[in-house]
């Protein structure tokens, strides 16, 4: 498996499909969803990106061999395995059937109903009621089909289950309250089964079904609309009559709306207000994290990246932490343990700009442990500073390191280089993951 890079923006439900498929197949996939690797609305409009992906849409996949692919279902098909695609011609056709069903019959009404509740789209009562009826219809079809089945196709999870689950995700999280979903118990049973599979949880985290149907909030909608500044009117200086006539003829052409080429889920991202920067109060630091990441990615760790790190590290503006997974007795197969690490990294995408970590799995199947070294902006444990970052961190014990101590220097060297004695662990190195 050559692997590749998935370009997307954070929390893009369409990107969940290939990411979950990759969890099942073991396909090595790197997510690029934040600067400097990828910045939505900027990178995807560059000539270089459009040459590879003419529509400029995400998710988009680029293999290490230069192979490029767009459309989330196609990417999921590519990174998946034969079991996910269907092991017989009949099953393969049925998988395609449910993927098409999802795109054609679930996504449109789901968007029309859910987006207004998120403040992304203006509320229209008639459109919302039609969407509710459309969702009742598709849930009825699914409920009948799942009455005697555990999964949509065959006896195991396939791309059909992954695709339909992702399309229903925001419905279950936002509007399908208990009374609405009650007639469709088979669908809910199947949905809960899917989202609680380790491969799904590694990407989605814990999925909580909504308790009360979310409603349109006019105030929230108004707040999420991009503000347009009205230029102040100034009295023009007297001009010759001829010039005035020419100005009337040359009326300015309005600039096209930047959202015109976005689909609804991308408009959601564009309309989403920027979260408050938890580090806005901190003085500017001399340590440039992005520059260190470039050194770490492109240069030798021991001879270039580590010397650069210690030469430029700002101990007043940054802190180094050691983390150890609390429940090693629950770790079984190595690949499942790695899913815990990669899943946490994927859900912490919004922390990448101001964070770096090397997390390592030690040991073997049924006898392993997870620990890592993290670097954060400021002196506090980053996860507590923003709701966007409060993900999985409570499953670890955290200890702040003294950056001037020999212990810290040894841990940073061993964990960043993935080599050393690791005396604090007592198990051999298995594999590591980098958060950057």
Curated annotation (Swiss-Prot):
Maturation and modification: Phosphorylated by CDK1. The N-terminus is blocked.
Composition bias type Basic and acidic residues, residue spans: 221-249, 265-278
Region (Disordered): 221-278
Keywords, in A-Z order: Elongation factor, Phosphoprotein, Protein biosynthesis
Molecular-function annotations in GO: translation elongation factor activity
Keyword rRNA-binding found: no
Source organism, top-level taxon: Eukaryota
Listed PANTHER family: ELONGATION FACTOR 1-GAMMA
Role according to the record: Probably plays a role in anchoring the complex to other cellular components.
Assembly, per entry: EF-1 is composed of four subunits: alpha, beta, delta, and gamma.
Protein known as: Elongation factor 1-gamma-A
Organism: Xenopus laevis (African clawed frog)
